[in-house]
Amino acid sequence: MFCNQCQEALNVIGCTKNGVCGKKGEVADLQDRLLYVLKSVSYYNLKARELGLNEETADKIVLDAFFATLTNTNFDKQAIESYIKKGFEIRDSIKAKLPAGTLPAEEDLPDVAKVTPENITGMDVAVHSTQNEDVRSLRELLTYGMKGMAAYAHHAYILGYKDEEIFKFIEKGLVATTDDTIGVDDLIGLVLECGQKGVSVLALLDKANTETYGSPEPTAVNIGVRGNPGILISGHDLLDLEQLLEQTKGTGIDVYTHGEMLPANSYPAFKKYDNFAGNYGNAWWRQNEEFEKFNGPVLMTTNCIIPPRESYRNRIYTTGVVGFEGLPHIHEKEDGTKDFTSLIEQAKMSKPPEQLESGTIMGGFAHEAALSVADKIIDAVKTGKISRFMVMAGCDGRHKERAYYTEFAKALPENTVILTAGCAKYRYNKLDLGDIGGIPRVLDAGQCNDCYSLVVIAQKLAEAFGLEDINDLPISYNIAWYEQKAVLVLLALLSLGVKNIVLGPTLPAFVSPNVLKVLVDNFNIRPNTTVEEDMKVLLG
């Protein structure tokens, strides 16, 4: 295997035997093959799309299977093999529908169009099959950005929201990574287009979530426990949460969020459930100790799952695109619903959660809530009560170097406000940083996709101050990345013209020196260093 798609890539180069994440080499190799099959599906669906014959089954397999290859999402060999089998079936179905003359002669077809279940095992389809370092780097940057795009499009899709242009771009991008006639300049263009489409998919998901569940509102979220047995839900999927809450109401079972599900506590639609108890624990990487102490069943809805300990292995379930060998999987029924009876019955026989902490933390400051007090914020900036906004969005991770973000938040002057989204928030959202005239010094917009809210807030503030360039606002960016959703968010920010981003805790292993130079020259991206040095740069 060779995998360097996440921030934990071994020695900032790549994992070659097993992943630091826990992914086995055999699964990594299968995921490489799956990705190549999705490129083949995309080749034919693009041809079909030109004729109005494209299939939604192709769009769905690309979203689902692409998402399954994200870091910490699907470790199940059989699930990946099933995606490969289904991909070939859909590919062949599309191919059979194409009118004669649509395709080149068989001998002129590219390899990606001729791949079969029989010959794919002997093909070199891994990252290093691309020899040119810069082409390889740009193909990876594009691929990982599109993985994030597929994940967000998947979340919107299950709520009934889709955008054909996003499907089309993902297919175009996947096929482009197999075309040796597409050089560095064109790949840079595709990477930038990926960022533009990233803004579109973030806006689509924001619309899907808010139109379905209401706009998040400032909420004091309980982080303690109650005396009832509970079910813990982790990941990002709000539809799974809705169904779980509906099925557990009146049962005496409480439901707690974990990790990136924390922002669900701020959506109006979920507040009607008396058994929605609050948030338990912290970011994904602490799940081993926290799931162990929860005592009840745990539902993993999307990334991020890590190899479970034996102590709770008999009470952790996967659903959706998540998979881990040996764990029970809750499948979606034909009508789109899921039956969580097995979790509910197990919860009834479980002890209540062990308390980890107590009190509340504030959330729910997405763009609508933040902009509802825009006048107050603008006045605070004009009077000097707020000197700067610090965007500290992104991902958390287990490396000790990430303590930097806690220390950075502590060291910020008292007249600065942190804007955050994603699980990076757990490094500082429980610090007592106070408020500025009633405005909390940590404004949490939500999940990683809610970085879109931070962009909307910045754009509206720029309008209010009469600025044409959001880089002229008193806003700085200290972004923490971990996986491929964060890659897309970064590309989306760049496509909007955001410059001077500090990125950490390490730069992506897949970015070559020449590609990094392009990012530095055009956007002034730089790696984080020390709290003291970065504070000087970011506070201007």
Swiss-Prot record:
The record, for SUPFAM superfamilies, names: Prismane protein-like (SSF56821)
UniProt GO MF annotations: 4 iron, 4 sulfur cluster binding; hydroxylamine reductase activity; metal ion binding; peroxidase activity
Location(s), subcellular:
Cytoplasm
Residues with the modification Cysteine persulfide, per the entry, are 395
What is this enzyme's EC? 1.7.99.1
Binding-site residues for [4Fe-4S] cluster, renumbered to this chain: 3, 6, 15, 21
Q: Which residues bind hybrid [4Fe-2O-2S] cluster?
A: 236, 260, 304, 395, 423, 448, 483, 485
Cofactor section: [4Fe-4S] cluster; hybrid [4Fe-2O-2S] cluster
A Pfam family assignment: Prismane
Per its UniProt entry, which superkingdom is the organism in?
Answer: Archaea
What is one cellular component GO term in this UniProt entry? cytoplasm
What keywords would UniProt list here? 4Fe-4S, Cytoplasm, Iron, Iron-sulfur, Metal-binding, Oxidoreductase
Gene3D superfamilies this protein is in?
1.20.1270.20, 3.40.50.2030
Record carries keyword Oxidoreductase: yes
The note describing how and how many cofactors are bound reads: Binds 1 [4Fe-4S] cluster.
Name the Gene Ontology biological process terms.
response to hydrogen peroxide
The catalysed reaction is: A + NH4(+) + H2O = hydroxylamine + AH2 + H(+)
Does the record carry Zinc as a key word? Answer: no
Q: What does this protein do?
A: Catalyzes the reduction of hydroxylamine to form NH(3) and H(2)O.
Question: Which HAMAP family would you find in this protein's record?
Answer: Hydroxylam_reduct
The text of the family note is: Belongs to the HCP family.
Record NCBIfam families? hybrid_clust, PRK05290.1
**Identification of the protein by name:** Hydroxylamine reductase
Q: Which organism is it from?
A: Methanosarcina mazei (strain ATCC BAA-159 / DSM 3647 / Goe1 / Go1 / JCM 11833 / OCM 88) (Methanosarcina frisia)
